[in-house]
Curated annotation (Swiss-Prot):
Catalyzed chemical reaction(s): L-seryl-[protein] + ATP = O-phospho-L-seryl-[protein] + ADP + H(+); L-threonyl-[protein] + ATP = O-phospho-L-threonyl-[protein] + ADP + H(+)
Family: Belongs to the anti-sigma-factor family.
Keywords carried by this UniProt record: ATP-binding, Kinase, Nucleotide-binding, Serine/threonine-protein kinase, Transferase
GO molecular function: ATP binding; protein serine kinase activity; protein serine/threonine kinase activity; sigma factor antagonist activity
Designated gene of the protein: rsbW
EC code(s) of this entry: 2.7.11.1
Record Pfam families: HATPase_c_2
Class in the EC hierarchy, top level: transferase
Function: Negative regulator of sigma-B activity. Phosphorylates and inactivates its specific antagonist protein, RsbV. Upon phosphorylation of RsbV, RsbW is released and binds to sigma-B, thereby blocking its ability to form an RNA polymerase holoenzyme (E-sigma-B).
Record SUPFAM superfamilies: ATPase domain of HSP90 chaperone/DNA topoisomerase II/histidine kinase (SSF55874)
Protein name: Serine-protein kinase RsbW
Length: 160
């Protein structure tokens, strides 16, 4: 039996000024699902990096679209970010991304690949497919125990 989920789809122009719309939509969806604040902030960075890669690399001179699909499951949020532009070898670049030498000055860090490193670090799972364009599937699991253990109950009871 297939796992039940809700799906939200969006398409926006692949322009930097529209990335905030995707980020805010994702934050609203994640908040509604019960994600912790820190996890939402992590996902905002990851989705921004995935979309910025498309804006910078996918369409060259042309303006294309970014397709975003949110899969809302009981225990996780799956985020698919896709384009139909020119692919670069994401997996090859990803394999070159590793721990950064913190003893080196920030000016010596590699310029390309930091976004991939961030996505990989901030999300629970990431899958990359490239054929005609690029598709990045990112997954973040809801840490309900953290909310239950760390959350302070709010009461309207007046104790004085």
């Amino acid at each position: 039996m297939m796992e039940r989920f809700e799906k939200i789809e969006m398409k926006i122009p692949a322009k930097a000024e529209y990335v905030a719309i995707i980020r805010l939509t994702m934050a609203g969806v994640a908040n509604r699902m019960g994600f912790a604040y820190d996890d939402i902030e992590d996902m905002k960075i990851a989705i921004s990096e995935a979309c910025t890669n498309i804006v910078q690399h996918a369409y060259k001179e042309d303006v294309g679209e970014i397709a975003i699909v949110f899969g809302l499951y009981e225990d996780r949020l799956e985020i698919m970010v896709a384009d139909n532009g020119v692919s670069f070898d994401f997996n090859n670049l990803r394999s070159k991304v590793g721990p950064y030498d913190i003893s080196k000055p920030v000016e010596h860090l590699p310029e390309n690949g930091l976004g991939l490193y961030l996505i990989n670090t901030l999300m629970d799972d990431i899958q990359i497919m490239h054929d005609e364009g690029m598709t990045v599937l990112m997954t973040k699991y809801i840490q309900r125990e953290q909310v239950e253990n760390d959350g302070n109950p709010i009461s309207t009871y007046n104790s004085y």
